[in-house]
Amino acid sequence: LKFLGFEQTFKNALTTLPMGGAKGGSDFDPVGKSDAEIMRFCQAFMLELWRCIGPDQDIPAGDVGVGGREIGFLNGMYQKLAREYHTGVLTGKGMTWGGSILRPEATGFGALYFTQHLLHEAGKDIKGKTVAISGFGNVAWGAATKAIELGAKVVAISGPDGVVAIKNGITKEMIDYMLVMRASNRNKVQDMADKFPKDCVFTADKKAWSIPCDIALPCAFQNELSEEDAKELKKNGCWCCCEVSNMGCQPDAIHFFQNNGVLFAPGKAVNAGGVATSGLEMTQNAEHLSWKAEEVDARLHHIMESIHEQCVKFGRQVDGHIDYVKGANIAGFMKVAQAM
């Protein structure tokens, strides 16, 4: 948790927005819990937290296990305790309570914008490329949505129970069903294959990395991609991995990618679109305005382009190769150091 907070500080610095960075959480697992149980936990959590947060203090947002529902419960309890209404206390809120449009899918959208610029820098085009995605939550949903919008072909999504291979590429109808799967709390990706048996093939206890692809997008949780997975990806023809989940790749996997000609970009740069859009939500709250989807998307795209430019600036080696890990670390550190 401490290291995630450390990483968050540099990630927020990369966004160019005036935000610090921190991480927090609990060991409460919402899987299998009723709405009432989750609400009671969120209320109890906020009962201890509310004095430590505020629109000009610390501003929590969602992450693994915390989506719009949980943010809504937390926000409602805060307003009750504070006895005055503040829209900017949390981000990731519903639109009714001062949330920003596109916030749920922002991490995935931003990741694909970054990937698009990375490929362009390497002289490649994202159109027609095959993509494997781990997970089927908000991040994976956003990534899959933007991937097909940009012309890529998503050939695999995975969950705790296994992987679904989609030979002809994921469709809009399948992407919409990902939200139904997540809302069911079953946590089983096999439901996708059961819903679309003609297009999907489910394999139990396998990862998305077992499916041949051009681009791998870890979108689930930290340390999900091991060195063995990296080797399997390389063997199956993968030549690019963009880390969408926080610290999704184990250090040995990153070293393997870097030493074997696989383009790799770290999570602190790739997934910064989520926190960047939280920053945009804070701006809208401060202005008491709600922007249209086109404006939020355009600002997000601009931020991700800026992050990519910073990575290239600080990560370009003497031979012209770009070390995105080094570039992201130096760019983030430079801003934090200058602020201090």
Language-model features, listed with the residues they occupy:
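N-terminal ligand-binding/catalytic initiation module
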Residues: L1-I101, K335-M340
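Buried hydrophobic packing segments
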Residues: L1-L4, L74, A111-L119, A143, ...
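Flexible, glycine/charged-enriched surface loops at secondary-structure junctions
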Residues: T16, I53-G62, Y85-G88, A122-T130, ...
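General beta-strand structural signal in soluble alpha/beta enzymes
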Residues: Q57-A61, Y85-L90, I133, A156-G159, ...
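Glycine-rich phosphate/diphosphate-binding loop of Rossmann-like nucleotide-binding domains
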Residues: T91-G94, G99-P212
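Adenosine-phosphate binding glycine-rich loop
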Residues: L118, E232-M340
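Rossmann-like adenosine-cofactor binding region
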Residues: G162-F264, A269
